[in-house]
């Protein structure tokens, strides 16, 4: 809270009677005071040593599992390396529960790991193409895409929200603020604000493509929600606040374990940084090789819900090849050599922040035909012309052409780095030989 907010809260608390607008502002400031304190404590937890975070994750996982409202009825929502690590981590501490995933959305190397670990495959409610054609491209961030989608679908009920997105001025629910974070950043307001009449009047543009945050709902969230309804199980999730976006504030305010009337979930890794997660992934990789025979792939699912398992498959590593190897950079921080984060091959959230080769460039390297489809063959405009991510990326100023040039540049840089490391090692060995000779 700002000093001005604190002073205003004191002024409102000193009043005997508050009018409607003052009361809304008072309620907002009280809530903000509590939430800000939670966020500060969460940030302190993020700065703790790895051992402390790991120990807390163990306690959080068991606390959720044993809660009377959960009573062991849990599952692990598995996707990329973060949640693969979570699944193995839970198993390593004695929490043996099912893992489920909409695996068809993931990279082939991730699907391979899912299969070997016995992860149950769920089906998306719509295909990736159907979601983009019906709702729009998932671009910039989930939060911003959701606001753009709201502007594109004006109703009387969302008029106040649309006004806040355009101007930053909120109503009663937002505490009658001005300049709030509800407003789209100026860069995106200029490009997308014209979807709303108020934005058009202010001179903002309307995008030539639809934008939406609905992809995750139809492809991942709804299938998992249906699994919960069928089984009564609640999820463990591998989310980390350090990844930013909506989850950062939600995890800080609601906590690692969240239990309410309609929502229950556990995120034991919420305070982890990327380095923490990769360190644990290496530990779980070692643990897996001692216990790999405990994991069997699902080879058949029967109509009654039971499954048939096959023989164990011994993975070379639990780290899917899309990530490359895990290495320590010059600052001593663990990194993955290739993909940093993964998801649907057509997802564009955060693409504007990536240097080339970006995720679409790397997709071209893995599968040129899939790249060609997502770039040029998803939708048709009113003139019958086909387009895809090419049009969306052009509009937001993200370069995508000639991915092979950037892939080659990256591989050359890696070769030079490996040669340099070899030379350094050879020099060190030579110096040791000289020392021994003396």
Give the location of each predicted region.
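ATP/NTP-dependent adenylation/nucleotidyl-transfer catalytic domains that generate, transfer
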Residues: 37-41, 66, 72, 262, ...
């Amino acid at each position: 809270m700002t000093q001005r907010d604190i002073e205003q809260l004191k002024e409102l608390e000193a009043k005997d009677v508050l009018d409607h607008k003052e009361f809304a502002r008072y309620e907002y400031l009280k809530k903000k005071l509590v939430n800000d304190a939670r966020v500060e404590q969460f940030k302190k937890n993020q700065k703790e040593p790895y051992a402390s975070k790991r120990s807390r994750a163990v306690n959080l996982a068991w606390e959720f599992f044993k809660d009377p409202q959960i009573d062991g009825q849990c599952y692990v929502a598995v996707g990329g390396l973060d949640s693969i690590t979570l699944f193995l981590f839970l198993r390593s501490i004695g929490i043996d529960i099912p893992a489920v995933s909409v695996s068809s959305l993931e990279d082939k190397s991730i699907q391979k790991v899912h299969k070997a670990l016995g992860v149950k495959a769920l089906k998306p409610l719509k295909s990736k193409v159907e979601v983009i054609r019906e709702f729009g491209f998932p671009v910039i961030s989930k939060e911003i895409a959701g606001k753009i989608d709201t502007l594109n679908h004006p109703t009387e009920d969302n008029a106040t929200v649309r006004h806040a997105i355009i101007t930053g001025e909120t109503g009663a629910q937002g505490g009658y603020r001005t300049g709030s974070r509800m407003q789209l950043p100026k860069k995106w307001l200029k490009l997308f604000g014209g979807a709303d009449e108020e934005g058009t009047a202010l001179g903002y543009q309307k995008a030539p493509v639809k934008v939406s945050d609905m992809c995750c709902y139809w492809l991942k969230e709804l299938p998992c929600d249906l699994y919960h309804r069928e089984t009564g199980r609640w999820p463990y999730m591998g989310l980390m606040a350090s990844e930013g976006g909506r989850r950062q504030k939600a995890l800080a305010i609601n906590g690692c374990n969240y239990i309410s009337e309609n929502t229950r979930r556990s995120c034991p890794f919420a305070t982890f940084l990327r380095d923490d997660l990769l360190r644990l992934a290496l530990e779980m990789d070692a643990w897996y090789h001692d216990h790999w025979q405990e994991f069997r792939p699902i080879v058949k699912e029967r109509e009654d819900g039971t499954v048939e398992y096959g023989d164990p498959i011994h993975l070379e590593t639990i780290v899917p090849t899309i990530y490359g190897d895990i290495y320590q950079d010059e600052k001593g921080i663990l990194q993955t050599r290739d993909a940093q984060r993964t998801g649907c091959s057509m997802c564009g959230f955060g693409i504007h922040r990536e240097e080339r080769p970006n995720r679409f460039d790397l997709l071209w390297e893995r599968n040129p035909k899939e790249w060609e489809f997502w770039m040029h063959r998803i939708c048709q405009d009113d003139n019958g012309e086909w387009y895809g991510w090419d049009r969306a990326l052009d509009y937001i100023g993200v370069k995508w052409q000639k991915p092979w040039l950037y892939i080659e540049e990256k591989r050359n840089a890696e070769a030079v780095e490996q040669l340099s490391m070899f030379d350094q090692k050879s020099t060190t060995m030579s110096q040791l030989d000289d020392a021994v000779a003396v």
